[in-house]
Amino acid sequence: MMRGNIAQLMQQAQKMQENLQRAQEELAKLEVTGSAGGSMVSVILSGTKECRKVRIDPSILNDQEMIEDLIAAAFNDASNKVDAESKERMGSATLGMSLPPGFKLPF
């Protein structure tokens, strides 16, 4: 009986690993836009939080301090969106898997 439980657990672990790998591949392709200042500044991040693009409205180019603040805010907005998307996708990758009590994934 114990052998059957171990085999089932190993199958679940393999399926979970495949699902997690697929979710990580999807995240690498993901692009998320964060914005600030009524979209005067926007930042596009990949699912791995690599900055792909920064857009700045020309009307604020003379205000360096505002630009700096808005870039930071837009980056943080995009970063929070990546975190939420990552949590959702990684959570759905383990959906239906019966994990032992207290078992937590590293994300």
From Swiss-Prot:
InterPro entries: YbaB-like_sf (IPR036894), YbaB/EbfC (IPR004401)
Swiss-Prot/TrEMBL keywords: Cytoplasm, DNA-binding
Signal peptide: none
UniProt xrefs under Pfam families: YbaB_DNA_bd
GO molecular function, one term: DNA binding
SUPFAM superfamilies: YbaB-like
Subcellular location: Cytoplasm, Nucleoid
Key word Cytoplasm present: yes
Major localization listed first in the record, in broad terms: cytoplasm
Any single GO CC term annotated in Swiss-Prot or TrEMBL for this entry: cytosol
Function statement: Binds to DNA and alters its conformation. May be involved in regulation of gene expression, nucleoid organization and DNA protection.
Similarity comment: Belongs to the YbaB/EbfC family.
Subunit annotation: Homodimer.
UniProt xrefs under PANTHER family: NUCLEOID-ASSOCIATED PROTEIN YBAB (PTHR33449:SF1)
Name by which UniProt lists this protein: Nucleoid-associated protein Xfasm12_1216
Species of origin: Xylella fastidiosa (strain M12)
